Amino acid sequence: MHKRLLLLGGVAVTVLMIAASATARPAAISTARASDATPAAAPFAQSWASVPHAAAARQAKSILVFGMEQDITGFNTALTCCGAYWAAVTGNVPVVRGAYNIDDKLRHVLDLVASAKATKTTLTYTIRPDASWYWGGKKTPVTYKDFAYTWQQLVDPRNDVASRSGYDQITGFTHKGAKQIVFTWKEPYADWPDLFGLVYPSQALAGQDFNKIWANCVCGNDGEPISDGPFYVSNYTKGQGLTLKVNPFWYGKKPSLKEVDFKIITDTNTEVQAMRGGEVDAINPTFGVNLAQLKGINGITFNQVPGLYQEHIDIQFGPKGQPLLRAPWMRQAIMMGIDRAAIIKTVYGSLAGNTSPLNNIVYYPADAAYKSDFGKWNFNPAKSLALLKKHCTGGPSAVSQSNSDTWTCAGYPAKFRYTWTASNATRTTQEAIIKQQLKSIGIEITDAALPANVVFGPTGVPSGNYDLANFAWVTLPDPAGFVPTWSCGGLNNYLNYCNRKATALMNASQTELDPAKRARLFQQADALMANDVPTIPMYARPNPLIWKSTVLGMKNNPSQVGFTWNVEDWKWKS
């Protein structure tokens, strides 16, 4: 996938959702070859009808069922509309490969290319000689044209991509034969290993509008499935799920499984019960206290690792947000009014471990460069109340859970919409706690729990239509992915925040090749942004992966590459 942040909201580790355009393919669609004689040649409902209900029967057929917490409405995760975690882990990572893969130890491993080399002036990729596309049963080679096409689409101003970072430093290319491409830099790009994380098939997409491709399939311009990974998307049906089938032309290790079915289960509690009851063989759920019931169950493996998941509450600065949020003292008051440590204890319970409030928005606690810049705004309701008294009227005289008074500030009531995705038990609990905590200091929260396709659709978070929005970013190890999120005019900057000094520092980091100097630039930027409080970092969310103990080969990956990074290794225990 591309080096960008992926949105995680809603009922799970998920998703930036947008409805398919009028010109997109129908929602229920088969992208398998007509010659496929299996039920998977039809939409998912028919495919699912042939999947055995008993795990032992699935094992006999080498079929695995994975619980999928969120639907998707597009597989082109490079677009602003479609930065969906579940789209990436189902339709990108196991299907369309990139220069590097990232393993469970967060190491970059050569994947589509045999070698990659960056200098101050060039970036050279030598493509694996055996790398080929599966296109509706036909075999076509992966060539330099695919890398060139990918770069051209990502820098084309007509395309609504979420990030051009790094790609916009490339000025042109040459090639040596079909399997080597040499890009030239305008300036070197520090995080170059995360470029070309997904390479598009140029021949299969010829003549297509990049903004509209892959709305309901991962396919070529003829609707036939396309893949250079271990699997291809055989079918997808909105609201139901999708099926992956083995790509016979995959250059890597031959998968042991013949089929992986992703069954959409949008309620987190229902998902847990599906795992307990054997309806699904594995889940990658939203981390929450409800998962405790799966620990210690015979026959279930429960794996939990520190994740690169930034759980946060975005604050809207733009015209669609409440005007009071543009005042730094209000944002500071809100953050000091939220007891993040208490929330962690409540929503995670015995699973919390050493999870603590996150006080940085470019680094995670395990990073050596992490500094507790936002710690100055830790829970302090008395100080928060004093700030509100200084700027507002009509609020409470003391902090009290029974308070019913709301401040009025500069003619506006201290009343804000709080948006999160419905059906998520963890975030619903989180919102209820925050609502009560802020009520005790005279700030009123109105509930805006909505379906994911509304929250992350064209009129939701990407449009800036919220006051406070609770979701998460899932990232790669390098902080470069945060640059288009926090910088002025950044393509991922849905909150419309701008600190020009912080932006200049982050932009400078993009071409600084010395790791220590680069870290200092990010540290300085974070310190400046901490003064502004553009967002409220909550915590670095742990990442769980839970599967039947009779399934072998699953390894949790804490980054946005996700759990399908090694799907070809999955197999049933013999």
Feature names for model-found ranges:
Residues 46-48, 64-120, 128, 149-152, ...:
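N-terminal lobe/hinge region of extracytoplasmic solute-binding protein
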Residues 65, 142-150, 178-184, 188, ...:
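Alpha-helical secondary-structure segments
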Residues 114-160, 182, 271-274, 324-325, ...:
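Aromatic- and charge-enriched surface segment that lines or borders ligand/interaction sites
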Residues 1-60, 172, 397-408, 574:
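Short, low-complexity disordered leader/linker segments with a strong preference
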Residues 102, 197-255, 259, 381-386, ...:
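Gly/Pro-rich hinge or "lid" segments in bacterial periplasmic/extracellular proteins
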Residues 57-59, 117, 122, 126, ...:
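Surface-exposed binding/hinge segments that line
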Residues 131, 222, 247-293, 308, ...:
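Ligand-site clamp/hinge motif
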Residues 35, 45-48, 90, 237-241, ...:
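Detector for C-terminal structural segments
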